Amino acid sequence: GMRNDEILTVKETAALFKTTRQQVRKMIANEELPAVKVGREWRVLRAGIMEFFEENL
């Protein structure tokens, strides 16, 4: 199974990007970040964040 450190909450992702949770949700909606829905909460895949940074830096 997936270890906890491989997925981040929207809040943790926002902190990592130094942005707002609203912006993170927008990125998920735009499919800029790979995320999975867990109940009513989004979980962002850490691997996807690293990919995003590599493409955008």
Feature names for model-found ranges:
Residues G1-Q23:
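Polyanion-binding surface elements
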Residues L8-V10, P34-L57:
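Short helix-start
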Residues L16-R43:
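Major-groove DNA-recognition helix of helix-turn-helix-type DNA-binding domains
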